[in-house]
């Protein structure tokens, strides 16, 4: 039996390009991968681009970035949340936070910070080394810095010292011992900490991340621990207010 000629549609199905490429990647009539960073914008033939780079003596492997895709995803995230907020009557201020563990390369993070400024975009660090990187790269004093992950004294100290330097830093508490350590370090450094609390919801959702909720989830404070934390903060705040004014709980 004679085999039929391979078609563009066969390549699209084989590589599932419509599944992961969203509206950015596709296959043109030459059978080449084409990228369209902006909706209704000009497409770039990646095969022709690589050929042109090789003519300029640029050898493989090559790392090709498309900042417009980053910009467009930031805009899309902000737009979707804004629409949902309008639909459900959500009135509070909100911020987009980018975890730098996703991609720590400086050009990527700088592009995200630059374009995200008008969308209240901040950065998240999950460790002391990541916090060092965030502090160094994020010069916007109005941008939020969220500290997650395991917190020892040195990590907390760095966050509090950065706060004293004018950074808007929030330490997110996942365990009671972290809260007590933050209060201890804040008193030593004479600073009123900005504290966030991760809550372990009793009800779990559905889908891929359903195990991250519910009483059996690994992260966050239970309802009883939350009450304990609030009582602890009420007592600690009376001690800290002698040094600073103002407190934040998110």
Protein language model features and the residues they cover:
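Flexible glycine-/small-residue-rich
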Residues: 199
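Conserved small/polar residues in nucleotide/adenosyl-binding loops
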Residues: 238-245
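Flexible glycine-rich active-site/ligand-binding loops centered on an Asp-His dyad
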Residues: 205-225
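A charged N-terminal "starter" segment
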Residues: 1-195, 216, 223, 227-231
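Acidic-enriched catalytic cores of C-N bond-cleaving enzymes acting on peptides and small amides
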Residues: 235
